[in-house]
C-alpha cells in the first residue's frame, strides 16, 4: 500500500472507530522473528506489571496544536516522581506494526525500575503530533509548553531531565538556555546537529564544515521522510483517544521510501536538484521550510535564517548541569567540545563545576556498541566499554532525586578514550592538563603527490620553497573513505579505514614523518595552516591526520576542509583568489586523542575534495549549489620559511 493510500485508509479507520465500529487490523504483521517477538512481549509484560501506561496523550501547545506523548510512571500513586523526557522526530510508536509486536520498551522499563516517570514525545508535525514539522525542533516554545505541562502533572515532582542521541539530542542545548523552572539537568549525546555557531565553528547544525556543505543531510532528510509534511496524517477534530491508539497499532507511519544508492544520487548537479533524479520533492532542502525560511542548501554559513530556528549558539547562556556524551568519529566532535568548554567558561561557578564530558572512540551514537574488541570502521580500538546506564542514572539520581550518591566526586570532569593505547583517561579540562603544542612543517622536493611522492614532515620549516602542485577536478573528486560522519547510506562506512587506496591518487599530497623513536600521545586540538595558490577564483583544501602502522596500514584519525572564499571568516563577504598569489588558509581546530606508538608514523594528506562527506567546490566562484558545470583548479601548496604550511598537535607527555 503506498503512502497516500495508507493515509486515506487511516482517515477512514479513524472515522470508523469514532463511529463506534472497530475494524480488523489493517496492517499485515511480518512475524519473521519469533525470538524477537517473544523478547518484546516479555519486556512489555514486565513494563505493564510495574507501570501506569498512558499512550497517545495529546498535549496542547500555546497555538492550539497538540503534541503526542507516551507516559510511563511507577504504579505507586502515593509518591511524586521526577521525569526523564525524550523528544524526537523519530518513530517511537509503542507498536512495531511490521513485526506484529511491541517495540523494544527497555528504556521506559529501566526508568520505571529506577524510580522515574518516562515521557516520550514526537516533535511538531511528526507521526501523531499535530502541526508542521520544521527542522531542528522549532518553535522552541513547544519545549517550554511541554515542560510546563509536565511540571503541573499531579504526580510530577516538577523536576525534569533530558536525554537522547542525535536528533533526539539536538534540541536540548537551545532549550537548556531558556531557563524553564522544571528543567533540572540534561544529557545530550552526539548532539552536534543542535550546535549552530560556537567560537570558530559555523557548522549550523552539522550543515557546514569550513564553509563546505556536509552532504549527510541530502540522504538523511529523504530516508526519514523529513523533506516535506505531505506524509503527515491529519486526524479529524475531536478524534477519540481510542481511535488514536487503534490507528497506532494498525499503521506504520514511518517513511519507507525506495532504497537509494547515495553514492550515485549525491553526484547529481546542481546540488539543489539531487532529489529530482529520485522522484522526491525538494522540500526544506532546496525550496523553503514550513516557517518560510529559505531552503537549507541555498544558505551561507552566517545566513540570518540559522539564528531564527532551534539551533543553539554561543550567544545563548546555559546555566544547567550537563553530562555531555561525544565520540571521536562523530560528525562534529570539534563544535561539540567547543560547546562544552563554552558552557564551562560562561556559566555561573556552581553550574560550571557541574559540566562533565565523556568522549568515546566510536562513531555517531554508537556508545553502547562498544565491546571487548570495539571495531570502529576497520580498526580494533580495544575494550572501550563503559557503564553508561550507571553513569546516567547516577547523574539523574543526584540532580532529579537529590541523592547524595557521590557521582560528581567520583566522576572525572572529562573522561576520554585514547586510541592506539586503547584506554580510558581522565582530566579536569579539555584539552588535558599538560598538553603542549608541537608543530610539524610540510616539505618536499615539489613532488609530494601520492604515497610514492617525496613529501615529509619536519620539526622546522624548510628554508626552500618547492611547492607541490595537483589538479583538482570536481568531476573526479577524492572519494570519502572513512571519517567522522553518519547517514550517507550503506555505501559509506564511518570510522578508521586504511587510506592507502586514496594515497595512490596524484591529487592527494602525502607528508609523513619517519618511524617514531618514541611514542607520542596527541590529545587536544589540531590546527592546520596551509599557504596555497590556485588558478581558480575559489576552491577547497582538505587535510587529514593519519597514523601509519609498521605494516603500512594508514588509518585516518581526523579530517577537515576549508572553502577558500571564507578564509577571512564567515561574517565577512567572500574573498576570491587571483592566479599567481599565495594565500594563508587556516582550518577550524580538529580534535582527537590518539597514541602513536614507537615505529609508527605521523602522516598528513592534503587535497581539495572528500566527497560526499563534503560537497564539491566547482571552482567557479559561483553559488555552487545551483551550478551544473565545474572547472579544473590547478592548486598548489607552498611550504618554506616564508610559507610555513604546518600541522600543530597537542602533545601530552606521560
What residue ranges belong to the model's regions?
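C-terminal, loop-rich substrate-recognition/catalytic regions characterized by aromatic stacking residues
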Residues: 30, 41, 237-275, 279, ...
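N-terminal cap/lid segment of alpha/beta-hydrolase-fold proteins
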Residues: 37-77, 512-518
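Accessory cap/linker subdomain of secreted extracellular hydrolases
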Residues: 42, 104, 113, 177-179, ...
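Proline/glycine-enriched tight loop/beta-turn segments at coil->beta junctions
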Residues: 65-68, 75-84, 156, 317-318
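Cap/lid segment of the alpha/beta-hydrolase catalytic domain
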Residues: 78-151, 200-201, 205-207, 368-379, ...
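Alpha/beta-hydrolase fold nucleophile elbow
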Residues: 154-166
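Short glycine-enriched nucleophile-adjacent loop
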Residues: 169-180
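Short beta-strand/loop motif that positions the catalytic acidic residue
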Residues: 318, 324-326
Amino acid at each position: 500500500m503506498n503512502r497516500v493510500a495508507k493515509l486515506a485508509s487511516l482517515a477512514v479507520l479513524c472515522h470508523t472507530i469514532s463511529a463506534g465500529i472497530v475494524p480488523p487490523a489493517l496492517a499485515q504483521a511480518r512475524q519473521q522473528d519469533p525470538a524477537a517477538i517473544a523478547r518484546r512481549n516479555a519486556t512489555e509484560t514486565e513494563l505493564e506489571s510495574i507501570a501506569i501506561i498512558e499512550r497517545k496523550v495529546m498535549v496542547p501547545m500555546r497555538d492550539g496544536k497538540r503534541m503526542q506523548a507516551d507516559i510511563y510512571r511507577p504504579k505507586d500513586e502515593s509518591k511524586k516522581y521526577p521525569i526523564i523526557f525524550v523528544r524526537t522526530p523519530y518513530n517511537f510508536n509503542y507498536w512495531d506494526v511490521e513485526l506484529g509486536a511491541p517495540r523494544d520498551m527497555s528504556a521506559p522499563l529501566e526508568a520505571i525500575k529506577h524510580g522515574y516517570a518516562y515521557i516520550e514525545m514526537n516533535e511538531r508535525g511528526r507521526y501523531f503530533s499535530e502541526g508542521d514539522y520544521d527542522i531542528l525542533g522549532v518553535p522552541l516554545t513547544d519545549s517550554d509548553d511541554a515542560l510546563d505541562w509536565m511540571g503541573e502533572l499531579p504526580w510530577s515532582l516538577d523536576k525534569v531531565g533530558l536525554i537522547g542521541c542525535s536528533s533526539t539530542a539536538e534540541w536540548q542545548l537551545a532549550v537548556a538556555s531558556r531557563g524553564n523552572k522544571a528543567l533540572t539537568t540534561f544529557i545530550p549525546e552526539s548532539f552536534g546537529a543542535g550546535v549552530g555557531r560556537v567560537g570558530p565553528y559555523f557548522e549550523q547544525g552539522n550543515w557546514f564544515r569550513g564553509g563546505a556543505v556536509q552532504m549527510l543531510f541530502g540522504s538523511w532528510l529523504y530516508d526519514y521522510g523529513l523533506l516535506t509534511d505531505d506524509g503527515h496524517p491529519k486526524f479529524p477534530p475531536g478524534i477519540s483517544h481510542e481511535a488514536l491508539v487503534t490507528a497506532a497499532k494498525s499503521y506504520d507511519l514511518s517513511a519507507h521510501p525506495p532504497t537509494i544508492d547515495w553514492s550515485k544520487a549525491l553526484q547529481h548537479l546542481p546540488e539543489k536538484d539531487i532529489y529530482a533524479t529520485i522522484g522526491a520533492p525538494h522540500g526544506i532542502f532546496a525550496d523553503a521550510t514550513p516557517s518560510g525560511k529559505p531552503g537549507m542548501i541555498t544558505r551561507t554559513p552566517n545566513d540570518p535564517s540559522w539564528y531564527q530556528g532551534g539551533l543553539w549558539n554561543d550567544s545563548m547562556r546555559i546555566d544547567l548541569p550537563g553530562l555531555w556524551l561525544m565520540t571521536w568519529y562523530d560528525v562534529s566532535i570539534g563544535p561539540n567540545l567547543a560547546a562544552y568548554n563554552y558552557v564551562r567558561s560562561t556559566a555561573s561557578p556552581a553550574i560550571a563545576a557541574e559540566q562533565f564530558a565523556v568522549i568515546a572512540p566510536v562513531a555517531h551514537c554508537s556508545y553502547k556498541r562498544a565491546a571487548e574488541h570495539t571495531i570502529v570502521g576497520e580498526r580494533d580500538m580495544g575494550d572501550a566499554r563503559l557503564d553508561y546506564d550507571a553513569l546516567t542514572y547516577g547523574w539523574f539520581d543526584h540532580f532529579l532525586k537529590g541523592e547524595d550518591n557521590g557521582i560528581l566526586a567520583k566522576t572525572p570532569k572529562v573522561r576520554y578514550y585514547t586510541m592506539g593505547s586503547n584506554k580510558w583517561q581522565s582530566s579536569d579540562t579539555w584539552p588535558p592538563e599538560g598538553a603542549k603544542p608541537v608543530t610539524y612543517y610540510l616539505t618536499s622536493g615539489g613532488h609530494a603527490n601520492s604515497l610514492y611522492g617525496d613529501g615529509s614532515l619536519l620539526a622546522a620549516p624548510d628554508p626552500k620553497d618547492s611547492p607541490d602542485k595537483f589538479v583538482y577536478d570536481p568531476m573526479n573528486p577524492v572519494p570519502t573513505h572513512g571519517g567522522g560522519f553518519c547517514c550517507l547510506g550503506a555505501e559509506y562506512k564511518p570510522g578508521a579505514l586504511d587510506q592507502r587506496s586514496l594515497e595512490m591518487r596524484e591529487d592527494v599530497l602525502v607528508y609523513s614523518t619517519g618511524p617514531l623513536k618514541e611514542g607520542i600521545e596527541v590529545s587536544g586540538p589540531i590546527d592546520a595552516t596551509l599557504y596555497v595558490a590556485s588558478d581558480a577564483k575559489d576552491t577547497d583544501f582538505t587535510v587529514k591526520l593519519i597514523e601509519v602502522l609498521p605494516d603500512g596500514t594508514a588509518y585516518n584519525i581526523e579530517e577537515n576542509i576549508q572553502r577558500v572564499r571564507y578564509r577571512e571568516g564567515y561574517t565577512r563577504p567572500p574573498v576570491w583568489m587571483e592566479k599567481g598569489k599565495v594565500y594563508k588558509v587556516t582550518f577550524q581546530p580538529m580534535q582527537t586523542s590518539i597514541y602513536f606508538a614507537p615505529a609508527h608514523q605521523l602522516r598528513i594528506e592534503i587535497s581539495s575534495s572528500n566527497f560526499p562527506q563534503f560537497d564539491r567546490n566547482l571552482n567557479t566562484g559561483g553559488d555552487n549549489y545551483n551550478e551544473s558545470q565545474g572547472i579544473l583548479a590547478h592548486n598548489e601548496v607552498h611550504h618554506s620559511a616564508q610559507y610555513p604550511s604546518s600541522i600543530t598537535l597537542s602533545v601530552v607527555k606521560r
